From Swiss-Prot:
GO terms for cellular component: mitochondrial inner membrane; respiratory chain complex I. It is found in: Mitochondrion inner membrane. Keywords: Electron transport, Membrane, Mitochondrion, Mitochondrion inner membrane, Respiratory chain, Transit peptide, Transmembrane, Transmembrane helix, Transport. Pfam families: NDUF_B8. This is NADH dehydrogenase [ubiquinone] 1 beta subcomplex subunit 8, mitochondrial. Complex I is composed of 45 different subunits. It comes from the Eukaryota. Accessory subunit of the mitochondrial membrane respiratory chain NADH dehydrogenase (Complex I), that is believed not to be involved in catalysis. Complex I functions in the transfer of electrons from NADH to the respiratory chain. The immediate electron acceptor for the enzyme is believed to be ubiquinone. Its main location: mitochondrion.
Length: 186
């Protein structure tokens, strides 16, 4: 009984201490506000127009993600283009992301920012890049084959060791005199 009472008093003390440390109106600042969350998927033309106005878009340009249960709601489906493709000389409100205030951001903006995926068209077409890559790899494989088939080593003499060609270390009889080895000097 005394242990239960001590436990209850300890819990009450912790609750009072926590109430004194953190004010009741405090919350974490990382949550998305209710205004930032997408609304329900628009079913009527009036709802579509209201959603387009909410995201500062024209009704003709507004197209929501398909209602397949992923939770995109009325968020607009923007083209899959990276921020790198946008004009670098324009006076953006947020120049690092190349965005203006009130402009809808791509749902996967973290994937399309400038230091990640670059979807801009390449100056050389894909087929030519592949031809150059595979041509280089084929040439290098051919050169490796030639080098393996026709080796070109520097001519060397036989390996020379000190102490009568390591006679004892190579298992020679210590009682016998080793045969003399001629060492060549350069």
């Amino acid at each position: 009984m005394a242990a239960a009472r001590a436990g209850v008093l300890g819990v009450r003390w912790l609750q009072k201490a926590a109430r004194n440390v953190v004010p009741l109106g405090a919350r974490t600042a990382s949550h998305i506000t209710k205004d930032m969350l997408p609304g329900p998927y628009p079913k009527t033309p009036e709802e579509r127009a209201a959603a387009a106005k909410k995201y500062n878009m024209r009704v003709e340009d507004y197209e929501p993600y398909p209602d397949d249960g992923t939770g995109y709601g009325d968020y607009p489906k923007l083209p899959d283009r990276s921020q790198q493709e946008r004009d670098p000389w324009y006076d953006w409100d947020h120049p690092d992301l190349r965005l203006n205030w009130g402009e809808p951001m791509h749902w996967d903006l973290d994937m399309y920012i400038r230091n990640r995926v670059d979807t801009s068209p390449t100056p050389v077409n894909w087929n030519l890049m592949c031809k150059h890559l595979f041509g280089f790899v084929a040439f290098m494989l051919f050169m490796f084959w030639v080098g393996e088939t026709y080796p070109a080593y520097q001519p060397v003499g036989p390996k020379q060791y000190p102490y009568n060609n390591l006679y004892l270390e190579r298992g020679g009889d210590p009682n016998k005199e080793p045969e003399p080895v001629v060492h060549y000097e350069i």
